[in-house]
């Protein structure tokens, strides 16, 4: 039975704010979670798992009604599942405005209407004489230049009408915006007010006078100004009710001219309405020079003229078409979750409504379609239609005097013309922003077509913040520098058109330059601007230099973005001149292998660490060359966390080290395959160390030990630590599983198999030494091979050994099989782990960011002292899920964005009620997904708290079977939420704290005892998050140093881990111990609350306890003071000090 989640299937939802038909407001939408009563019932147990309801036989076989049959047929035709239909219906029910609330809003609107009619008139004055305005009110308009012709006086509005989504019935919660169109009387305006911002300034003065008479009225909790869609030429007034309804609604006052007042032909995109001589404050116009067109300025006035006409158009379309209203609501939610519905040049609710009406007029949709069908068709249209090349128009009039689509394309980057044929609804949208919308629509359709995912949840419930969507993000921190950009690019005409807004003027040109320069390295480039906020009516509007940040995001091509060479045209071609002009001094002539001589640009990049910085180098170079934006004004965060994967003072993330290890491993594999005189044939050689799948946080380095720092065992040609010297650097053995063929020579007793394997280990050592001159150190369980500076730990395996370990004989003499801890461990090491490692190695080849993402995730887990609770394989699988099931995103192409998504996945996944399915190699099919879900639900109480299913492990979750505990998982979820919030805030606010290592420093105040460690004895000291203040010689010679005779280094020696093991064995019943494996200099100790309950006086309870002096009975309690003393005694030489944080103790 399918599990149903009522109330749109989620407890929390960030959804679209209601932008009205012109809105860009945004806030989180809370969707309540009420479990449906149909087919679902809560089990009485405390495990809080959903279980099927048992129906009576009569209910089970009752024939369906006609309505039910019709609904089932409709569901089958329109939706993947009945669940999707129910989720959409519940979401619409949640976001639509209830009738009770509508009545409250209507009452508020009537009161506003009455107040607007009582505002007194003012005498007629020059536009520049604003002395009549109250000194406590500031005009919401940047009046530059200040001098302008014209007269102004305030007269009561000629009409006040509700426009936008409220009347249409398409506004959605949580924030309801109601748009009021307040029409200025014709007497205020003059015929030539379309020129030189006269109308715009009269509009602002009219708004300011209204604000002065409403600001102290007790009806309102707040009266504020803001810009409509961050367009500074269109200020509006925001009114919110007093009392409990303050957050219910925001009424937005739009000032507009009387219908038909301005002659439309004067405002076509090829006409000029802002004189250059006026804007530059020149006394006379230059003779023979025509003023350039002002399409953006003209479009702003036209949009005010057509408010009512657009409402009538949408009302006619929505008549007898309930699916249109539902689709608008769904599309608003979709846009909001992707942060596309707010700010300058956004795709808001009004635009979505007009697009749906366009599709209706072109018969792409019809009035019998459901909201879901309309949504799908709209997304399909967006994904396949490029409005930057082939604009669309809703105009049906054949008037030849109207501007043509080519006229609009000449003036605007994106073209969508309104029904009147004069307004470009996408005038402020850049081509880059539209391509982002296209990309999101295309990705969303893929999600909807995938029956193995919850498309509703991914499309409409999961937020896609900008910083988590793009692989690299950078900020232009000093917007004032764009003034110089406009001058450098000679954009005076465009600047005049934009009313001096140099950010909006320069942005399209900057994006064009970057897109050309980055070329195939990026598959998508887009931007977001800081949303211009509301401000009090007594404050001056923010100047352009205070506009905030310009943030640009790059979606990288994983194969191409690290390219260090840009090959240009042939040196003698006509394009070569343009190439040199674009790249400046970076362009040079180069001869290529095919003999051609071409222009080229070469970027420095020896290591992969350097190559990942190529997009950053290109961005900074081009912005300085073409836009006069210095490097100091660019905050590039794409590689912000590389520093935590570097050792000590090194500036490398060591991918090349892993490639070197893999090459050495491949060579060893060949040597093993080709060994002569082995009693049995080798059937497979498989590496299992994380570095062989590119996920080791700090891969092993080639080592050459300095004899003087060790004691020498000459007969074994190996070294042992010298206690008088600092602990040697940690040498990690690279584990290799060597499977031998099955044969009758193998015994059938598990102990005999172990002895035979030990003999094989010795024989392997002898053959590798004699045939390939490798230094080997055999033992009963493995053979260590010292090769190329690395130590490979070769372990012989026999595929039937785990089976023999499971054998036991019953008292009746029957042979049976039962899993034992030993058999499961061996099976994991010799079967599951080799297969997983080879699969993840392949995944990294397909997605190069996989390794870096996994390394960051593991480094962060260790830094939070939780490394012992989560296996490396568990974390690798969590990261693999991000790449194999990235929806609603595309697979990450940078480790940073992969890490952000890792934090979000762990923090938000429903671990209690859902298995995390990782479809490695795409082996799982639809029916297997259902099988895993059903098996999980039926056996939930017996399964691990974190359940990860793979094609080879559908029922057991072997990598999380023992760890984490419920408490550790809950702790991780809390840390993920907080770290995600902090890191995203840092990445999106370049003016704040730039210490990205902050989230890698654990809070220590929650521990009861802190054990400070002696840095001399920390073998991985250089791996610490913060570079150690003092370094020690760890007994290793520098790379390239010559040695006379090789000696086996000290392998796998980490005294801190050995100390931790002792502590857990001795005091595990009293406390938990936490440590950062990678250079952590502190061990955190937490008391176990249950261990401090008094125990009866028995010999079995005496260890670590003392008599309870407060009790009359013979009871024992833990001796905490002695425990603290024991820590220093046990850790002599390792422990620098013990801090008992007794203020936390609750004993």
From Swiss-Prot:
Biological process, per Gene Ontology: ribosomal small subunit biogenesis; rRNA processing; tRNA export from nucleus
Keyword Cytoplasm among UniProt keywords: no
Record flagged with keyword NAD: no
GO CC aspect terms: chromosome; CURI complex; small-subunit processome; UTP-C complex
Region (Disordered), start-end ranges: 1-49
Compositional bias of kind Acidic residues: 15-24
Major location (coarse): nucleus
Key words of the record: Chromosome, Nucleus, RNA-binding
InterPro entries, A to Z: NOL6/Upt22, Nrap_D1, Nrap_D2, Nrap_D3, Nrap_D4, Nrap_D5, Nrap_D6
Subcellular location, record wording: Nucleus, Nucleolus; Chromosome
Signal peptide range: none
GO molecular function: RNA binding
Family to which this protein belongs: Belongs to the NRAP family.
Complex and partners: Part of the small subunit (SSU) processome, composed of more than 70 proteins and the RNA chaperone small nucleolar RNA (snoRNA) U3.
Record function comment: Part of the small subunit (SSU) processome, first precursor of the small eukaryotic ribosomal subunit. During the assembly of the SSU processome in the nucleolus, many ribosome biogenesis factors, an RNA chaperone and ribosomal proteins associate with the nascent pre-rRNA and work in concert to generate RNA folding, modifications, rearrangements and cleavage as well as targeted degradation of pre-ribosomal RNA by the RNA exosome.
Protein name from the UniProt record: Nucleolar protein 6
Gene: nol6
């Amino acid at each position: 039975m399918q599990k149903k989640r009522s109330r749109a299937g989620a407890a929390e939802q960030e959804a679209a704010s209601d932008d009205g038909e012109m809105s860009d407001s945004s806030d989180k939408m809370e969707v309540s979670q009420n479990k449906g009563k149909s087919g679902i019932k809560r089990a009485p147990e405390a495990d809080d798992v959903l279980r099927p309801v048992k129906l009576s036989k009569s209910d089970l076989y009752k024939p369906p009604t006609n309505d039910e049959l019709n609904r089932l047929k409709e569901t089958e035709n329109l939706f993947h599942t009945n669940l999707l239909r129910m989720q959409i219906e519940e979401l619409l029910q949640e976001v639509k405005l209830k009738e009770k609330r509508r009545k409250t809003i209507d009452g508020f609107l009537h009161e506003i209407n009455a107040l607007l009619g009582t505002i007194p008139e003012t005498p007629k004055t020059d536009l520049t004489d604003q002395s009549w305005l109250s000194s406590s009110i500031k005009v919401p308009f940047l009046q530059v230049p200040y001098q302008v012709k014209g007269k102004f006086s305030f007269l009561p509005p000629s009409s006040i009408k509700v426009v936008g989504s409220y009347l249409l019935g398409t506004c959605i919660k949580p924030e309801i915006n109601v748009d009021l169109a307040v029409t200025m009387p014709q007497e205020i305006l003059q015929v030539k007010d379309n020129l030189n911002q006269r109308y715009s300034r009269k509009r602002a003065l009219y708004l300011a006078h209204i604000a002065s008479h409403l600001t102290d009225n007790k009806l309102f909790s707040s009266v504020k100004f803001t810009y409509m869609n961050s367009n500074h030429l269109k200020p509006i007034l925001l009114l919110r009710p007093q009392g409990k309804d303050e957050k219910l609604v925001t009424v937005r006052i739009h000032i507009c001219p009387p219908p038909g007042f301005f002659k439309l032909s004067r405002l076509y995109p090829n006409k000029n309405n802002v004189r250059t001589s006026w804007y530059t404050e020149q006394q006379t116009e230059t003779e023979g020079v025509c003023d350039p067109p002002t399409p953006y300025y003209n479009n702003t006035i036209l949009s005010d003229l057509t408010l009512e006409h657009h409402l009538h158009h949408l009302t006619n379309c929505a008549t007898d078409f309930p699916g249109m209203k539902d689709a608008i609501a769904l599309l608003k939610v979709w846009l909001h979750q992707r942060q596309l519905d707010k700010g300058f040049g956004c795709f808001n609710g009004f635009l979505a409504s007009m697009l749906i009406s366009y599709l209706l007029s072109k018969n792409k949709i019809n009035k019998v379609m459901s909201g879901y069908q309309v949504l799908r068709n709209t997304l399909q249209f967006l994904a396949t239609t490029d409005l930057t090349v082939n604009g669309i128009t809703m105009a049906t009039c054949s008037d030849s005097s109207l501007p043509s689509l080519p006229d609009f394309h000449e003036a605007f980057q994106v073209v969508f013309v309104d029904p009147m044929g004069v307004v470009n609804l996408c005038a402020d949208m850049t081509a880059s922003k539209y391509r982002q919308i296209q990309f999101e629509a295309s990705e969303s359709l893929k999600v909807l077509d995938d029956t193995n995912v919850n498309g509703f949840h991914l499309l409409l419930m999961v937020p896609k913040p900008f910083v988590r969507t793009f692989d690299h993000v950078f900020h232009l921190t000093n917007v004032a520098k764009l003034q110089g950009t406009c001058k450098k690019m000679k954009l005076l005409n465009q600047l005049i058109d934009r009313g001096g807004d140099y950010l909006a003027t320069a942005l399209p040109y900057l994006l064009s330059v970057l897109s050309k320069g980055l070329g195939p390295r990026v598959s998508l480039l887009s931007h977001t601007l800081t949303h211009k906020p509301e401000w009090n009516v007594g404050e001056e509007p923010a100047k352009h230099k205070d506009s905030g940040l310009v943030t640009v995001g790059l979606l990288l091509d994983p194969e191409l973005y690290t390219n260090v060479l840009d090959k240009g045209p042939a040196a003698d071609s006509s394009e070569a001149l343009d190439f040199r002009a674009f790249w400046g001094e970076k362009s040079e002539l180069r001869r290529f292998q095919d003999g051609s001589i071409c222009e080229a640009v070469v970027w420095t990049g020896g290591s992969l660490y350097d190559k990942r910085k190529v997009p950053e180098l290109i961005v900074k170079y081009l912005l300085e060359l073409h836009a006069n934006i210095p490097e100091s004004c660019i905050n590039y965060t794409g590689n912000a966390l590389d520093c935590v994967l570097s050792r000590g003072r090194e500036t490398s993330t060591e991918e090349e080290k892993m490639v070197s290890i893999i090459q050495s491993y491949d060579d060893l594999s060949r040597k093993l395959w080709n060994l002569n005189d082995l009693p049995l044939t080798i059937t497979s050689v498989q590496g299992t160390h994380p570095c062989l799948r590119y996920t080791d946080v700090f891969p092993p380095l080639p080592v050459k030990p300095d004899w003087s720092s060790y004691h020498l065992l000459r007969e074994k040609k190996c070294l042992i630590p010298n206690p008088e010297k600092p602990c040697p650097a940690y040498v990690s053995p690279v584990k290799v599983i060597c499977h031998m063929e099955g044969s009758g020579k193998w015994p059938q007793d598990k102990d005999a198999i172990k002895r035979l394997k030990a003999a094989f280990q010795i024989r392997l050592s002898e053959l590798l030494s004699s045939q390939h001159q490798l230094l080997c150190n055999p033992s009963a369980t493995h053979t260590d091979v010292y090769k190329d500076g690395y130590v490979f730990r070769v372990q012989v395996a026999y595929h039937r050994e785990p089976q023999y370990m499971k054998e036991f004989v019953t008292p009746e003499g029957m042979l049976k099989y039962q899993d034992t801890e030993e058999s499961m461990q061996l099976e994991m090491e010799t079967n599951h782990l080799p297969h997983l490692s080879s699969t993840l190695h392949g995944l990294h080849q397909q997605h190069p960011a996989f390794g870096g993402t996994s390394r960051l995730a593991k480094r962060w887990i260790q830094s939070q002292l939780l490394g012992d609770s989560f296996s490396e394989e568990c974390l690798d699988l969590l990261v693999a899920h991000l790449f194999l099931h990235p929806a609603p995103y595309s697979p990450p192409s940078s480790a940073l964005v992969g890490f952000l998504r890792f934090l979000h996945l762990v923090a938000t996944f429903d671990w209690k009620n859902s298995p995390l399915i990782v479809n490695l190699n795409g082996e799982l099919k639809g029916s297997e997904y259902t099988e895993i879900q059903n098996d999980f639900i039926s056996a939930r109480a017996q399964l691990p708290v974190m359940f990860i299913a793979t094609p080879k492990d559908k029922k057991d979750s072997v990598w999380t079977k023992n760890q984490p505990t419920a408490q550790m998982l809950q702790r991780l979820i809390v840390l993920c939420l907080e770290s995600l919030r902090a890191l995203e805030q840092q990445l999106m606010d370049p003016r704040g704290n730039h210490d990205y290592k902050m989230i890698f420093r654990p809070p220590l105040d929650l521990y009861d005892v802190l054990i400070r460690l002696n840095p001399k004895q920390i073998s991985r000291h250089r791996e610490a998050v913060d570079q150690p203040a003092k370094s020690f010689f760890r007994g290793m010679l520098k790379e390239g140093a010559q040695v006379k005779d090789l000696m086996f280094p000290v392998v796998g020696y980490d005294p801190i881990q050995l100390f931790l093991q002792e502590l857990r064995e001795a005091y595990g019943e009293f406390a938990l111990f936490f440590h950062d494996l990678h250079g952590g200099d502190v061990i955190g100790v937490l008391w176990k609350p249950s261990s401090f309950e008094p125990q009866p006086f028995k010999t079995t309870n005496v260890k670590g306890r003392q008599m309870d002096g407060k009790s009359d009975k013979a009871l024992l309690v833990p001796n905490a003071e002695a425990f603290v003393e024991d820590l220093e005694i046990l850790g002599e030489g390792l422990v620098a000090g013990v801090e008992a944080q007794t203020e936390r103790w609750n004993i």
